[in-house]
Swiss-Prot record:
Reaction(s) this enzyme catalyzes, per UniProt: L-tyrosyl-[protein] + ATP = O-phospho-L-tyrosyl-[protein] + ADP + H(+)
CDD domains according to UniProt: IgI_1_FGFR, IgI_2_FGFR, PTKc_FGFR1
Modification comment: Autophosphorylated. Binding of FGF family members together with heparan sulfate proteoglycan or heparin promotes receptor dimerization and autophosphorylation on tyrosine residues. Autophosphorylation occurs in trans between the two FGFR molecules present in the dimer and proceeds in a highly ordered manner. Initial autophosphorylation at Tyr-653 increases the kinase activity by a factor of 50 to 100. After this, Tyr-583 becomes phosphorylated, followed by phosphorylation of Tyr-463, Tyr-766, Tyr-583 and Tyr-585. Ubiquitinated. FGFR1 is rapidly ubiquitinated by NEDD4 after autophosphorylation, leading to internalization and lysosomal degradation. CBL is recruited to activated FGFR1 via FRS2 and GRB2, and mediates ubiquitination and subsequent degradation of FGFR1.
Positions with biased composition (Basic and acidic residues): 136-145
Protein name: Fibroblast growth factor receptor 1
Length: 822
């Protein structure tokens, strides 16, 4: 009889707990039995920390039950329940709530409550405003207390200062604390490597929070390495403490997946399942979740490749944290099987797989524990059953994984996995592949294609590439024409493609074809394949050069892309400069058409739209400039070369490129000095591209030698406003050139601002020819011969052209070189 009363009491208590409101993790008054005050222990946990809860137990406890917000708490890969204790690893804000530990015993039941708040604030990047306020109040209180005895400075929280060596990746925020006290209140100052540390000693400066005795440095770079010493002193003494900072420089690599994740799962029918996949990547990764499925009763196709279904893929508004977790609700027997986490970036692809086993749900029968022996029997039987299931799952997984191929292709909702080509070295299987990547075949197989009649490229053996039916175009439907130029890996020729549109098989389309040069190497082949695979992954957009097809079989590799008839944006702008201007190298030249202000803003708007799309696909361009934007017959701007696997820092800064311009003039300071490439560094380059547009193809930083440019950028100098540029657009350029990357606008914000400016700009606002021209940067600076060249800036100019006269240099250009101090 007493047992039934206990059970009834427990049911009433659980029902009351279920009524608890989620937004406020507090216990309602009606949940407090018989008016007895209920104690709730409050816990504040930072994201990523270990959450530990321990229940108070009586000696005669027979059962323990854990609830969160009135719902039964179950174990997962992060949550471990061991009787009276609960541990949650890598806590996240979703773990916040009201936890309850309900214990039953012959003498009654007891409940312990924990109110858990997992703060969204990261301790390394936030300003701890609450701490500042409270500390300030304490300081004021300390100062106002009368008759306080003098005390030399001392540490108030020495346990928080035990970690002296801090190794962090570049671009992270670093915060050092020296919490201390004394009477009178001591002062705080910071040294770097034993010398006084001032904000202007680093790009972006730093913040000192005197209320919390801390220093904060945003977006750290390798030059921030060193020893940082805090000195706390008053008239009665001085103490100091030194932290060592090591900034780890990021290097490009394909995504790295944490070993053991995702982990195999064995759950009951109707349960919820969570797969976790930790991805580490410097170039931002594109993550997908796949499930291996059966098609017509078979998991393997005729070509011995498995079928998969895409369950989750990254969108414009999804974050990497959201993509790292796959949730399955109310699982059924059909959900059992193999699941794969696939991550890719501009360097390559990686994947891990795990198995889900679904078991028949066990009926829950209410029973009263009559003896501890009965409870032990249930525990032993349950443990033996679970161990057997786990062993069975491991055996099945080993048998299945031995027959799987590791080549993945994931662009259709349900499709066969095509052979994925690594984006660096194709001819060997990577030795660092994970255990779940049992690749046993060469992804690019050596073969002799003697039937093709094509001469073998120097330094490159011939290879058989896997055919992709969605992109493959027969060679007899491609007619090659005149050369258009030379690219990074080879040459580009004009061609006519027949039947690119499957619905119109006889339509002829003008296209551009990228191919290798005769002296190409294996690395050139690797890079061209890398660019093709990246274009497939990124997809299509109006303002980027889109992939149309490829010829990979029975001959050399041809990559077919859209053709832009009006050349690159820089040449397009120069050809449309108003006649009679001093900086025009041919004053008698009549432009093809005159551009209005609205036309120029439209150019910028279209490029921003293309970059916004690339950013949404986690693609970092690294070399955005007017020369890499192409113009179609309909004046549509298309961003090119976004799929190149380039390493800009292998370029000699003192060597001219083919068009006489160096990438350094478009590179952000963090990319130039510390090799950190992000979407924010692309925004800096976009600001330089804006300057090119409104100078009608001018050369950035005219007359400035490389060594001087480095110095001026570090000192905060920026280029002047072009004459035909509004103040609003110039401020947009300056925002793009902010020294702190996080303070620059995003491409989404730039698109919104330029869209508004386009709508407000009149079609009749042509360039004002009466404005003085000394602020324009000449397209061809005066470096054409020994009689009018400057040795300092010859690295920034064009090679001499026979029909171009030597232009006089403007005095104002020599005076300030078109630069302002920010």
């Amino acid at each position: 009889m007493w047992g039934w009363k206990c059970l009834l009491f427990w049911a009433v208590l659980v029902t009351a707990t279920l009524c608890t409101a989620r937004p406020a993790p507090t216990l309602p008054e009606q949940a407090q039995p018989w008016g007895v005050p209920v104690e709730v222990e409050s816990l504040l946990v930072h994201p990523g920390d270990l959450l530990q809860l321990r229940c108070r137990l009586r000696d005669d406890v027979q059962s323990i039950n854990w609830l969160r917000d009135g719902v039964q708490l179950v174990e997962s890969n992060r949550t471990r329940i061991t009787g009276e204790e609960v541990e949650v690893r890598d806590s996240i804000p979703a773990d916040s709530g009201l936890y309850a530990c309900v214990t039953s015993s012959p003498s009654g039941s007891d409940t312990t409550y924990f109110s858990v708040n997992v703060s969204d604030a990261l301790p390394s990047s936030e300003d701890d405003d609450d701490d500042d306020d409270s500390s300030s109040e304490e300081k004021e209180t300390d100062n106002t207390k009368p008759n306080r005895r003098p005390v030399a400075p001392y540490w108030t929280s020495p346990e928080k200062m035990e970690k002296k060596l801090h190794a962090v990746p570049a671009a992270k925020t670093v915060k050092f604390k020296c919490p201390s006290s004394g009477t009178p209140n001591p002062t705080l100052r910071w040294l770097k490597n034993g010398k006084e540390f001032k904000p202007d000693h680093r790009i972006g400066g730093y913040k000192v929070r005197y209320a919390t005795w801390s220093i904060i440095m945003d977006s750290v770079v390798p030059s921030d390495k060193g020893n940082y010493t805090c000195i706390v002193e008053n008239e009665y003494g001085s103490i100091n403490h030194t932290y060592q900072l090591d900034v780890v420089e990021r290097s490009p690599h394909r995504p790295i997946l944490q070993a053991g994740l995702p982990a195999n799962k064995t759950v009951a029918l109707g349960s919820n399942v969570e797969f976790m996949c930790k991805v580490y990547s410097d170039p931002q990764p594109h993550i997908q979740w796949l499930k291996h499925i059966e098609v017509n009763g078979s998991k393997i196709g005729p070509d011995n490749l498995p079928y998969v279904q895409i369950l989750k893929t990254a969108g414009v508004n999804t974050t990497d944290k959201e993509m790292e977790v796959l949730h399955l609700r109310n699982v059924s027997f059909e959900d059992a099987g193999e699941y794969t986490c696939l991550a890719g970036n501009s360097i390559g692809l990686s994947h891990h797989s795990a198995w889900l086993t679904v078991l028949e749900a066990l009926e829950e029968r209410p029973a009263v524990m009559t003896s501890p022996l009965y409870l032990e029997i249930i525990i032993y039987c349950t443990g033996a059953f679970l161990i057997s299931c786990m062993l069975g799952s491991v055996i099945i997984y080993k048998m299945k994984s031995g027959t799987k191929k590791s080549d993945f292709h994931s662009q259709m909702a349900v499709h066969k996995l095509a052979k994925s080509i690594p984006l660096r070295r194709q001819v060997t299987v990577s030795a660092d592949s994970s255990a779940s990547m049992n690749s046993g075949v060469l992804l690019v197989r050596p073969s002799r294609l003697s039937s093709s009649g094509t001469p073998m490229l120097a330094g490159v053996s011939e290879y058989e590439l896997p055919e992709d039916p969605r992109w493959e175009l027969p060679r007899d439907r491609l007619v090659l024409g005149k050369p258009l130029g030379e690219g990074c890996f080879g040459q580009v020729v004009l061609a006519e493609a027949i039947g690119l549109d499957k619905d119109k098989p006889n339509r002829v389309t003008k296209v551009a074809v990228k191919m290798l040069k005769s002296d190409a190497t294996e690395k050139d082949l690797s890079d061209l394949i890398s660019e093709m695979e990246m274009m497939k992954m990124i997809g299509k957009h109006k303002n980027i050069i889109n992939l149309l097809g490829a010829c990979t079989q029975d001959g050399p590799l041809y990559v077919i892309v859209e053709y832009a008839s009006k050349g690159n944006l820089r040449e397009y702008l120069q050809a449309r400069r108003p006649p009679g201007l001093e900086y025009c190298y041919n004053p008698s030249h009549n432009p093809e058409e005159q551009l209005s202000s609205k036309d120029l803003v439209s150019c910028a708007y279209q490029v921003a739209r293309g970059m916004e799309y690339l950013a949404s696909k986690k693609c970092i361009h690294r070399d955005l400039a007017a020369r890499n934007v192409l113009v179609t017959e309909d004046n549509v701007m298309k961003i090119a070369d976004f799929g190149l696997a380039r390493d800009i820092h292998h370029i000699d800064y003192y060597k001219k490129t083919t068009n006489g311009r160096l990438p350094v003039k478009w590179m952000a300071p963090e990319a130039l000095f510390d090799r950190i490439y992000t979407h924010q560094s692309d925004v800096w380059s976009f600001g330089v591209l804006l300057w090119e547009i409104f100078t009608l193809g001018g050369s950035p930083y005219p007359g400035v030698p490389v060594e001087e440019l480095f110095k001026l950028l570090k000192e905060g100098h920026r280029m002047d406003k072009p004459s035909n540029c509004t103040n609003e657009l110039y401020m947009m350029m300056r925002d793009c050139w902010h020294a702190v990357p996080s303070q620059r606008p995003t491409f989404k914000q730039l698109v919104e601002d330029l869209d508004r400016i386009v709508a407000l700009t009149s079609n009749q606002e042509y360039l004002d020819l009466s404005i003085p021209l000394d602020q324009y940067s000449p397209s061809f600076p005066d470096t054409r011969s020994s009689t009018c060249s400057s040795g300092e800036d010859s690295v920034f100019s064009h090679e001499p052209l026979p029909e171009e006269p030597c232009l006089p240099r403007h005095p104002t250009q020599l005076a300030n070189s078109g630069l302002k101090r920010r």
